[in-house]
Curated annotation (Swiss-Prot):
Its main location: membrane. This is Cytochrome c biogenesis protein CcsA. GO terms for biological process: cytochrome complex assembly. It comes from Microcystis aeruginosa (strain NIES-843 / IAM M-2473). Belongs to the CcmF/CycK/Ccl1/NrfE/CcsA family.
Amino acid sequence: MNLVSLENFLDNTSFLVLFLTMLVYWAGAAFPSIPLLPGLGSTGVAIANLCIAALLGARWLEAGYFPISNLYESLFFLAWGVTAVHLIAEYTSRSRLVGVVTTPVAMGITAFATLSLPGEMQTSAPLVPALKSNWLMMHVSVMMLSYAALMVGSLMAIAFLIVTRGQNIELKGSSVGTGAYRLQNKLSTTLSAPIFMETANGGTTALLTPTLTAMATLSPQRLSLAETLDNISYRVIGLGFPLLTIGIIAGAVWANEAWGSYWSWDPKETWALITWLVFAAYLHARITRGWQGRKPAILAASGFVVVWVCYLGVNLLGKGLHSYGWFF
């Protein structure tokens, strides 16, 4: 089997394994009494991670350079990063719920790379002179790892918002998610049926008395789940943000060496800055401003869209120095 055939086998295998693993995690969430499913899910993600690593290694041997120079390679590197961050988050949190939201994204990335990209974008090609630099591995790999971590953290925030929908959740204790939650019931004021009373002059008057109606509260199990999701989200974003910062700085140094300017407001650079600002605002709100509960989760959830626009949306528009030029 030559390297090209091996790569085709590995990319299809990684997609199939992630698809089956996604079904296992969903089944485990629907039927938590089945003890075998969580272990199968973790094993599936580990196998997919190894398959993608082997694919990237084969690509490296075939092309002779670190395989992150085109969209196909970067998508698989991103999928590898998502599965790696998943394994770290799952191990540290001891929660099998991580895979419920991360495996669909990892599977979707591999499906897009394997099934949707044109054939010419899946083949390796010699590097252009501008990319023949050690900064390629330093800058791009760190940026892709930061995207993976920030995506996983944002997914945990989205899951937190779903679990706590319709409720006002606040975190007691430190901002790192180690305290317990308290639930503030949302009370709505309504008017009871009128009570008619006779007045002194023989007439009648209607008395309207307000009543308080409390919304349904979360169960203790859901409160514990919300705490776990918030904790994972905060810690994973705390991992991805320094990587994003390092990646942006490395890119600026590389740009100065290649084009004589640290920053040129290329669309990719602009959206990288927007991504940095969104997650900087999230961490600032959590650490300094004391935001807790749903408000910072909404900010983190919006970062999921921002990361995808920065990584894929700008690249596919065919504009700027970072374009893959597929749509235009």
